[in-house]
Amino acid sequence: VGGGIGHLSAWLFDLWCGEPSDEKQNIDLKPDSFIIVEEGARFGVIIDRLIRRYNAESWSRVIAKPWSEITAEVTSWSAAAASLPSSARPSDIPLPVSLIIVDLPDSERPDAASSAFDILSPDGLLIVPEPEVPTGDVGFPEEGKEPTEAQTKVIAFNKWISFIKRVSENHSVSFVELSGGTLAVIRRIA
């Protein structure tokens, strides 16, 4: 989620497919399917070219929609078609999902992680960078005004803490420190 201009996607395609110009490589590590969600249609076109560069059209695709819209549709269709076999359920994303990587701006990350966790399969993994930890006194948002950038960080981080508290009660949560931040790895327990 959050394909950007494809840096992470390109790295994963290199891992799964090898260098596209080296025809002698025979790497078969690719997943059954790989769906890249990118809200911006412009970046979606760039990622689509990346998919074609790696000849990955048969198992990967890009969806140019907001993540919140996709998860709302997937959840609704799943509930409406619960009695149908999974192959007959219309959805942008086949459920359940075994791995979701969220790479969105800090302010969007907590809500995206929460909705991603909701469609994760039992034993599925969610990988998401922790939002930046806010520092200093930022005051309170004034009524009728947009919060400042610092206040938005605090709001996002508080949502993140609430999400982590909720999922850590019954699921496995790990944190890995990286240069420039912390990566959260959340495993949904069956």
Residue ranges and their predicted role:
Residues 93, 106-190:
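C-terminal substrate-binding/active-site "lid" region of AdoMet-derived donor-dependent transferases
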Residues 1-72:
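SAM cofactor-binding core of SAM-dependent methyltransferases
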Residues 49, 76, 138-142:
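Short aromatic-enriched loop/helix-cap "lid" or pocket-rim segments at secondary-structure transitions
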Residues 75-99:
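A short acidic, Gly/Pro-enriched loop at the edge of an enzyme's catalytic core
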Residues 100-106:
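Switch II (G3) loop of P-loop NTPases
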Residues 10, 14, 75, 110-114:
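Amphipathic, non-transmembrane alpha-helical secondary structure
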Residues 16-17, 52-56, 79-82, 144-150:
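Short, hinge-like loop/turn segments at secondary-structure boundaries
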